[in-house]
């Protein structure tokens, strides 16, 4: 059985079904601003990419299949390639290579905390590195199949961890780590709530990925970074399962939640999170402001933030980003910097 993958380009960002060719204006902008060559370079198709052979032995595959079932373990090149890294510029450039590429040696799709614990123990005994995988949108190398002293690497796909629970009294939601951001918001909206976390990777990233990377989003000015929304989390390690943050607050000193938030999966596998949510706002007011330059814009936005009770979205683009945004909209632009604000309420 094929291992499920998110509907995203294997060698780029976005859903391939929604891809559009670059306009002449954007192509000209890339040439002038970045020195991009006028010639198109043929990249390999997914069928032309060559991967280094899997280092998993038949015994390794059998041990993993004994935990999750043979249909939830794959060493097929297509499954390995789609989990070979994230979506940084370096990741995507590597995918253009016609030389043999590195990739995890296998993909394992567990369905419970117990299965993850057993997988970690199997891999520990067999010296197999484990890389947790959610939506595949990392831009900091968190998904690289680094072997080091290990004989092989497996990608631990968490897409089956998609449970949702809502405590309306405490305004907290318990979400599975493999739940994609859009699906989480859709399910919460059915009950009149939202998480309100919208990073640029939102369409493909998962709840666990938000936590493992300490994600920030466009609403972070109002609701805080993702780690500020976390009230509790469950982590599976080779030594057992940790349920952290059982109470809303604690007077204890060290907070073990901080060890795993932003850890990129290095210390354990996050499988569920309890998160602060809020009612969907009745009103949203969108406003845009222009400033002569970035310094003046930054001074104005700093004053707004220091006053308190500011907008949910408070974003200032520098001169270059403002110019590119104008070009993408087919506008010539008039220079300066653009600020976007969103106010929410009843």
Cite the ranges covered by each PLM segment:
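Residue-level signal for inorganic ion chemistry
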Residues: 64, 123, 240, 341
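Short, well-ordered beta-strand elements within core beta-sheets of diverse protein domains
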Residues: 106-111, 275-276, 285-292, 339-344
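FAD-binding subdomain of flavoenzyme oxidoreductases
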Residues: 162-315
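A conserved active-site cap/scaffold subdomain adjacent to cofactor or substrate pockets
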Residues: 293, 308, 332-346
């Amino acid at each position: 059985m094929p291992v499920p993958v998110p509907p995203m380009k294997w060698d780029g960002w976005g859903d391939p079904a929604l891809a559009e060719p670059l306009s002449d204006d954007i192509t000209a902008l890339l040439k002038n601003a970045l020195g991009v060559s006028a010639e198109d370079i043929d990249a390999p198709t997914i069928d032309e990419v060559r991967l280094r052979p899997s280092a998993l032995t038949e015994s390794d595959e059998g041990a993993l299949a004994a935990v999750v079932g043979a249909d939830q373990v794959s060493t097929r090149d297509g499954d390995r390639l789609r989990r070979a890294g994230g979506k940084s510029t370096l990741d995507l450039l590597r995918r253009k290579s016609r030389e043999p590429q590195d990739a995890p040696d296998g993909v394992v799709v567990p369905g419970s905390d117990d299965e993850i614990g057993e997988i970690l123990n199997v891999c520990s005994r067999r010296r197999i590195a484990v890389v947790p995988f959610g939506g595949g949108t990392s831009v900091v190398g968190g998904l690289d199949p680094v072997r080091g002293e290990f004989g092989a690497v497996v990608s631990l796909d968490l897409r089956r961890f998609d449970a949702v629970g809502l405590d309306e009294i405490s305004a907290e939601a318990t979400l599975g780590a493999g739940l994609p951001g859009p699906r989480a918001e859709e399910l919460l909206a059915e009950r009149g709530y939202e998480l309100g976390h919208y990073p640029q990777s939102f369409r493909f990233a998962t709840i666990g990925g938000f936590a493992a990377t300490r994600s920030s989003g466009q609403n972070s000015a109002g609701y805080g970074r993702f780690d500020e929304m976390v009230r509790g989390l469950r982590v599976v390690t080779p030594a057992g399962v940790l349920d952290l943050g059982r109470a809303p607050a604690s007077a204890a000193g060290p907070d073990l939640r901080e060890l795993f938030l932003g850890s990129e999966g290095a210390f354990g596998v996050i499988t569920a999170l309890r998160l602060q949510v809020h009612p969907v706002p009745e009103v949203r007011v969108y406003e845009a402001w222009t400033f002569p330059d970035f310094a003046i814009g930054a001074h104005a936005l700093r004053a707004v933030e220091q006053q308190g009770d500011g907008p949910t979205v408070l974003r200032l683009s520098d001169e270059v980003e403002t110019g590119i945004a104008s070009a993408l909209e087919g506008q010539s632009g008039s220079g300066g910097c653009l600020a976007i604000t969103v106010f929410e309420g009843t």
